[in-house]
């Protein structure tokens, strides 16, 4: 399969495509595309909405932070916001360029440990890493849709943390809903589920008869569920 056929096949023929990816595990092109899409989205967000608006919104929706900021004199508060604004965009760019590949590596290693270590699937790290990179391609579509929504909405109404209404959290009050519940609901995102299913399809294709689709899905969902619950617990503690 050529690279273009792989990129389109992930969406239209995932089983056949991931079988080819497992046989010849290349990962650079999908990883670069995911990174470029993320950087483009955050660049346009910084230009159209602005990081100061995002920072103020985050403070307004977190009662604990809001109480802390109210104790600070207005001049010092504005200076602190201005300082944080300078580094906010850099942080998101860093997260996209550095942390996304790192998280892919960690995810691949964990899935490999479960699939091969616990289930004797016999897959290799290079295969799983390539599968994770290609399975992340729906993120490009998510960023593209988010850009469209961003320019259709007023900058004050656009929510960077949850830009699309493809999860239950989009229909919840972010201020009054318990942060644990809100974080879990936000994690149940259509694109996240899509990525999970693609990863499981890829893992099954790489393992062949040594692993069922249910087993592959378990190997992917287990670490994701643990991470979601951990993140939701932390969000609940610090809300």
Where are these regions (language model features)?
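Short, membrane-interfacial amphipathic segments enriched in basic
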Residues: 1-12, 80-84
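Individual transmembrane alpha-helix segments
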Residues: 77-103, 181-193, 201
């Amino acid at each position: 399969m050529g690279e273009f056929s792989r990129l389109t096949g992930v969406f239209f023929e995932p089983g056949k495509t991931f079988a080819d990816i497992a046989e010849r595990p290349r990962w650079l092109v999908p990883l670069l595309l995911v990174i470029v899409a993320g950087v483009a989205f955050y660049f346009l967000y910084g230009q159209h909405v602005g990081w100061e608006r995002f920072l103020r919104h985050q403070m307004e929706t977190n009662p604990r932070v809001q109480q802390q900021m109210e104790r600070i004199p207005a001049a010092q508060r504005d200076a602190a916001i201005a300082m944080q604004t300078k580094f906010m965009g850099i942080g998101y760019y860093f997260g996209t360029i550095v942390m996304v590949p790192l998280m892919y590596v960690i995810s691949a290693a964990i899935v490999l440990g479960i699939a091969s270590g616990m289930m004797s699937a016999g897959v290799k790290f290079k295969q799983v890493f390539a599968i994770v990179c290609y399975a992340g391609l729906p993120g490009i579509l998510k960023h593209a849709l988010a850009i469209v929504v961003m320019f259709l909405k007023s900058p004050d109404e656009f929510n960077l943390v949850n830009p699309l209404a493809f999860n239950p959290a989009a229909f919840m009050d972010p201020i009054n809903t318990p942060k644990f519940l809100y974080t879990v609901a936000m994690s149940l995102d259509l694109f996240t589920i899509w990525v999970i299913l693609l990863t499981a399809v890829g893992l099954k294709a790489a393992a062949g008869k040594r692993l069922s689709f249910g087993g592959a899905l378990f190997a992917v969902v287990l670490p994701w569920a643990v991470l979601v619950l951990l993140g939701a617990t932390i969000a609940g503690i610090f809300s």
